[in-house]
Amino acid sequence: MSSQVISASRLYQIVASPTSDNDAKSRSINELKTHVKKDFVDIKQVPKYVEALSIAVDISDTGISTSSFSVLSHLVKRVSMQDSSGEVLKSQSYLVLPIIINRLGDIKASARISAKKALEAYWFSAPKEVEDSIIDIAFSHKNSKVINESIIWLDHIITNVNPHFKINLFLPHIVKLLRLNSDSDEVLIENIKTLFKDYYSLKHNRLYKFDLSKEFDTQKIPSNVHESIISQIGTSSSILMKQATPDIGLDHNFISAGTTRVTVNSMGRDKGTISSNSSTPASLSSSTMSRPKSRTNFHNYTKSISPSQEDEQITKPSVHNSAFNKYNTNQMSAPAKPVAMVNENSNEINSEISPEIEKIIAKTFTYKIDSSILPLDVKDVDDLCGTINELLPIFEGKETEFNWGMREKNIIKLRSIIRGNSSRLFTNELTSYLKESSESICKAVTSLRTTLSSHGCHFLKECAIILKEHFDPLVDSYVPHLMKLCSATKHIASSNANMALCAIFINVPYNYRLLHKILVSANEKNVQPRSYSGIWLQVVLVRFHDTSSFSYRGSNSISGLDTSIKILTKLLADPNPNVRQVAKDTYWCFWDKFPSEAESLLTRLDTNVVKAIERSKPRTITSRNQPSTLSSLTARKARPSIKESIIARNKELRKQKDQTSISRPSSRINSTSSPCPPDNDYLQKHDKPQFSTLDSGKFSRLGVAKRTPSTSSLSRVESNQDAITRKVSDSVSSNAKKHNDSQGINADAQIQNIETMKSTYSVDDNSSNRTNMEQTNKFESFDKQSDPILKFLSSNQKEFITEGINLLKYAIMGEEDLSSEVNGLLKKISVRNQDLLKPLFLSTDNLFKKTYQFFSFEDFFRVCCILIHTIDTRLVDLIVSIAGVDDIYESAIKLISYTTNLGNIIDDSDLTMQIIRFKSIIVRSIIEFLNQGLDKIPISDSYFSKLVTNLFELVSLVKSTGLYKSFCELLIKLYSINPTLFTSELQMIATSTREEVEYVVGIDDVLDLNRGHAINFTTQYELTRVVPGNNLRKMSPLKAPSDLTMVVPVEKELFEDDNIDIDSKIQSESANDTGFRTPPKLAGNHTSPIHSERSTIIETDGNISDNVEEYVNDAMDVDQNPSEEIVNGLKNDIEMHNDDNKVKEKTSNDMSDSLPLIDESDNIFVEIDSDSASRKPDLFTKFAQHDNSSELVENFAQVKITELSKQRLRNNDPIKKFIDKVDPLNKISLKNKPISIYEDVNFKGSPQKVKDYSYTELNWFNFQLAKLAMDKEDNQEIDYCIEDFKSLCDNLSSKKIEGKEFVSVLNYLQNIQISNAEFSRYFQSSGHSLIENSLWNFFDNHINLPVSKKLSGLILLKQLLINRLRVSLDRLWNLLVGLSSESSSSVDELSLAISEAFDEMLAGLFSSEIIFARILTTLENAVLERESFSLPFILECLSKVLSTNAVSLLIDEKLIMRIDNVLSGFMNDEEVEIRRCVISSYGKLLKASRISSSIETNEDIRSEYSVMDDILKKLSIPQKKLIEYYSQS
């Protein structure tokens, strides 16, 4: 008995819900574990399981966290067995792999073992993702255990799993670890030695030993370590050095991008490699990464990596030495202004910078510009503009597998342009073009493709070095994207961004916004930008410390010096040791430039920080010139204990208690200690009046004090810091206890008690601060370390954060000065604990507006969507009043893109989890906001396109939810704003989604070549609806043919309000000419697009009586000469019907006058000429259908199943069939006859149905027609002259036909059905064969025809096939095969045209069996004469034929064996496309054989499936899996 299946959504709700207890979570997780271990899991629910478990592993409860990881490990193993494609695990690698790799460093051995087993199972399904994660996460992990275990895991894979596994990808990183830890981590060194020994001792890896030796020399591994490892392998390093001597000139053709370079051939190929300064050995470049054997064909790819001189880009975050190297000299060098000198006779660009700055960045990257790229000169400004504009179109839209290579080539070309003469001769124009194209370049910089991103970063670095101060206008366009990239998890990308930013800071002139950006980076939650911010600050200090602008206080009264102190204060107290090390180096740089300010800064720092700074003192700073306060601060008495501080503070409070006045505290900013509980009498006496005043909005009367500088001494601050947290914690816990003991206490009273406590203690603190002010006045600025708001908001406990939010609320209302650090803390809270922000967002409108200044609008809008559940007009007006239009639409678009694709969230796991939890709430809020906001906020075309594109992705998500009605209203509103842009974006989405949206908004585009434009109808039902009336029951069977396209019941509610008879309503829509009534817009209660449309076509008496003969011929579709009795009977019926019409028209004249009718000239389905007027009665018959449901019931009641003999089937009288078909009363007479159902015992399958062609499908042929329709003259008329047609055919046959003549021939072919009668008869008799023969003559010796004429001929040929006119199959097939051999690529225009022509062959005009036999014959000849055939095209055709339903009726054992004999010879072909087509054909053949086997009842006939089994047994496992995959498509 299988275990209970756990619902993924239910598990997610339990785990993510804050109200669920730990027991329920643990129980649910254990149930899932039992299910996963025993039974198969539902693959579709795996992503939701992973999301739930990723939340559960972070729960503080140890038992839940351990169980969750155990379940996750079992789930990975289970999915790897079930999902042979590996797509599920690949898509979830961003969530699962970081969890597994982090567990490699777990304290428990069992957890580490489980992690390694799970990683191995994951590797079998997603090898590339696992290997990339090991490099990006494991090798740069701060836990040394993780690094060690990852090395051990690699050794396990080589020795126990796959001895052919290649470590070329990991080699540079492993050697880097060896170099960094050669003296510190002996265990890691031994593990690496073991790995190298096990790997290079294998027989097939011995030839690659010299690669290891070369890597050691490149990264300068100590000789003792080098020799010890090489000796273990068994070869001396001297021999390896001889083997590793580079062959100069082996690989000259490369473009360098740091550690990454791209091999190119005149910018024509993109072959990605990663190499060192020396040439790549042939053995290494030809080696491939070995994958798990079961997935070799899926994942093999060539990859080799070796570090260059910029090897720091692939290592862990650099750890700076404690001694600052740049102070080794006794005298500092004056900063020199960087100058980039371009040598016009060489492609090298010399860049000179200050030696001091060079030492700062030396350990991070190489400042020198790469010389491997040749400069590209331009003639003039127009040449520069044209060259850049040619490079930009490829960057439009999203990055895909097919365009990233071209983007990389274009960035390389931009690197050549910046090296050329444009930077000297056209500097301003070049700068302007770079600013306009910033969006495209930033797409390359932030790309997930490492080589593309590297080239983008190097391009910006080179721009800054070459353009220097001219790069300043581009700073705001590029720096934000680079700083965001610094937070990337991929260390190469992060290092490249840091390199580009350093180059910018080195070269651009000073501006305060640069320092502000550094300050923002110093407050980032990611450690990498915080570490880099110290380096950037050093560069700025060295360059601008002696400039007046650096010390100038601008409009915000903040100088560069003040901002530098803020950055240093933040970095020196950073929890990360790497950041603190950089900060200490930065401090000594700051001390060298501003000694007095540096000494003052020391007095504000913690004692431990000061001691750490003392230990990192450079050697050049002796006791004589070190900071004077440094010794005194480090030697001072230790601060008092917590107990002493509490006793002293209580004494002070008792003295001040009697002197405290009843008023609101002047400021909570000067408070340096946390409150402790006052007595209850005081609370009861003073808390309520204070809160009533605040809540009433009269905050200004309380005399709120502005922030005043902190005056407490350094020792006083330090002695009270610990007491702050302790007392506030006691206060909160005390309040919680009171609440539990007395449940009847009002919640508002408790809040007031807490507020009053804060007021009392703030008053006491103010008194204490005034005393301290009299004693000392050292600090002239506010001390952030003592700010209670910052302390509360930076806490991890919700109680403290809540207190901080309340304090911040009243500080905002009082318009107090607040630290800029509040912004970063609020951003963190908005992602992790957004519910705590309710006091700021759900109070008054004034507070709501003021709160906005502390958030970016994206964060502000996201919190609004989550917290505010009702989006009304007031909220929309508030948001519009405080934010810009661009910010609103940009934020809405981003949030929608996050909900549809979590991959759009870059390196923010907290935000990812928030979007997962509140996805539905965010989508609902955005839809409601846009529904109301679009009427008030103008929207530009660019934002309109982005918005509708993202909304289209929501269609499938909201369709079955309650949001769908509002979502449809939003789409209709957007369509009404800009129909053209809406329709163009709609064409880019999937067909199913497009049809859904078209149905919602009422779009139905029909392309008419003769008119040259598209006419829109409300829906596709407009032209096919039939509204039956009571009067139709009296009509003869001739007037109610059975071939109507659609019958829809009358919607009575359309006429209930007017009390109008339905038949009268129908007749009111009649007119003298055939026409369509304009569909009304959606209004009132008519929500369905179908309900809103009605179209009626009624003919006048004159038309009907004049054209009775034509009418009968069209309605019956039989002999053109009917009997006189039939015609007379039809005339009588029509006259009776017209009499009824006349009577009803008298009662509905007023209504018919008000109905708008479209003239025939506007009807794309009616051709305007004299010869076509006689065809109008045919349209009338489509509205003569009566309700025959009772007749159908009667017929089916008389069904009698009989089996006729074969002889009777053969002896069916064709004359009798013809008489029955012509007889107008045959339908009525059939009611009395039994209905026979025949069993086709000797006929396999049903007759093949000819498919109708769709001119609205997006393909090459329709695109050509659309182009011709746009170029066609409006007044061009077609004269269907037989002589002109013959003349055109003669020109076609002699290959002299040109553009206008070609269009004329195409028009003849397209309008055969509506041409005059004389031409129609001629074309049916001899014109068809004439145009066919002309085409064959045209294509004779087609190898000499230009491509444009070949395409024109194929258009005519396909039009013949679309008209369902038979042509010679043999000549047609030979022509397509011959043309396919002349195409240069499988994706060029000629190949598309040929492929579409073959698709039309399969539309039913020719028998599938005949086409099948022709293809097999051609393939059998191709086995012997390969060079004379285009194999990919023929094999693709075979695959298409095998995909048709008719093939399953033809399959038998002999045919399967024949196909196998043909295809087996191409299974191992050198061309990938041929192998793909062969595998695809085998897959379709397997599918067809299974279908054939399932429908056969004769056991002798069902043997072909066993034949397929025999064929599959001959193939390899990967080939079998591929065939199985294609058989399911």
Swiss-Prot record:
Comp. bias intervals (Polar residues): 295-308, 619-634, 708-723
Region of interest: Disordered: 266-314, 617-638, 651-745, 1070-1090
SUPFAM superfamilies on file: ARM repeat (SSF48371)
Keywords: Cell cycle, Cell division, Cytoplasm, Cytoskeleton, Microtubule, Mitosis, Nucleus
Subcellular location: Cytoplasm, Cytoskeleton; Nucleus; Cytoplasm, Cytoskeleton, Spindle
Sample GO molecular function, one term: microtubule binding
Keyword Nucleus: yes
GO biological process, one term: mitotic spindle assembly
Family annotation (PANTHER family): CLASP, CLIP-ASSOCIATING PROTEIN
Functional note: Microtubule binding protein that promotes the stabilization of dynamic microtubules. Required for mitotic spindle formation.
Protein name, entry field: Protein STU1
Organism of provenance: Debaryomyces hansenii (strain ATCC 36239 / CBS 767 / BCRC 21394 / JCM 1990 / NBRC 0083 / IGC 2968)
